[in-house]
Amino acid sequence: MLSINPTLINRDKPYTKEELMEILRLAIIAELDAINLYEQMARYSEDENVRKILLDVAREEKAHVGEFMALLLNLDPEQVTELKGGFEEVKELTGIEAHINDNKKEESNVEYFEKLRSALLDGVNKGRSLLKHLPVTRIEGQSFRVDIIKFEDGVRVVKQEYKPIPLLKKKFYVGIRELNDGTYDVSIATKAGELLVKDEESLVIREILSTEGIKKMKLSSWDNPEEALNDLMNALQEASNASAGPFGLIINPKRYAKLLKIYEKSGKMLVEVLKEIFRGGIIVTLNIDENKVIIFANTPAVLDVVVGQDVTLQELGPEGDDVAFLVSEAIGIRIKNPEAIVVLE
């Protein structure tokens, strides 16, 4: 750098207006250099957390450029005039338009993140089946304690264990050009939310099925309502030995369709009869195998979903011709009384 930094000059008086403008120009240069440095380091970082922080700091530096530029334009009217002149030259040569006070464009740049975030959460909320019915506990930290509860000579905790909260992630990409001109399609964020929910529900079901101590019983074909009712009542009886309920069941749509038959003894469809029995909810999800049905006591004393981080959207920055976004959540399931869970298979 060839210019003299006015802060290095020995002095006994305040800066002049010209020196303040010099300081601001130097500050802008320093911030631009810092932006390049952080983005270059992020580009070659394989650690997602390091990359995330570097890009976040780079965005903060870009805000600092705007702050220093605003002060400089206030002090130096000539700079404003020359900037506008430069914008006009670019427009004549390339057709690209730029404006110092283009409020509409500024609002567009600010709004795209919120529009994508709103579409993402819409996909999550509409796609969820399990979390709409299961007890949810929000905690701080990256792990949770599971207290295994038994009902022998009084209610007591017989075992404690600690588990990490799994972090679920999905990335999606939006074209830089589309973000700039506002032609991007928010449905890509909605789809990312739906895929996150698929991972979320698969994790919950996988954890339930693999938990030590749950009961297992034979699942028949359910070709007639009597078979289905018999299976479910036997499983309910087994689960009720360990909990007073209310009881719910988790079932695949194809298996659920077999409940949409008239149960002759009641004159109603079997599913309507079961809704009166399973007041903890009949949860239909594609994320459980057709040949498995889970009957469980739907109460926090038996199980709850642990949320360490709600669904979050982060802008990671440019990757080629796209801008990358990361969707994440930290979620797990805590099973405290496995004896109140029965799997038909």
UniProtKB/Swiss-Prot annotation:
Pfam families, per database record: Linocin_M18 (PF04454), Rubrerythrin (PF02915)
GO BP of this protein: intracellular iron ion homeostasis; iron ion transport
Coiled coil: none
Family annotation (InterPro entries): ENCAP, Encapsulin_nc, Ferritin-like_SF, Rr_diiron-bd_dom
Description of activity control: The ferroxidase activity is inhibited by zinc.
Entry superkingdom: Archaea
Primary location: other
Binding site for Fe cation 2: E31, E61, H64
Enzyme class label: oxidoreductase
EC number per UniProt: 1.16.3.1
Keyword Ion transport found: yes
Residues annotated as binding Fe cation 1: E31, E61, H64
Keyword Cell membrane annotated: no
Residue ranges, annotated region (Ferritin-like domain): 1-109
Entry keyword set: Encapsulin nanocompartment, Ion transport, Iron, Iron storage, Iron transport, Metal-binding, Oxidoreductase, Transport
Physiological role: Fusion of the shell and cargo protein of a type 1 encapsulin nanocompartment. The nanocompartment is probably involved in iron storage. Expression in E.coli generates spherical particles (PfSPs) about 30 nm in diameter. The purified N-terminus has ferroxidase activity.
Family stated for the protein in its record: In the N-terminal section; belongs to the ferritin-like superfamily.
Protein name stated in the entry: Ferritin-like-encapsulin shell fusion protein
Species assigned in the record: Pyrococcus furiosus (strain ATCC 43587 / DSM 3638 / JCM 8422 / Vc1)
Underlying gene: enc
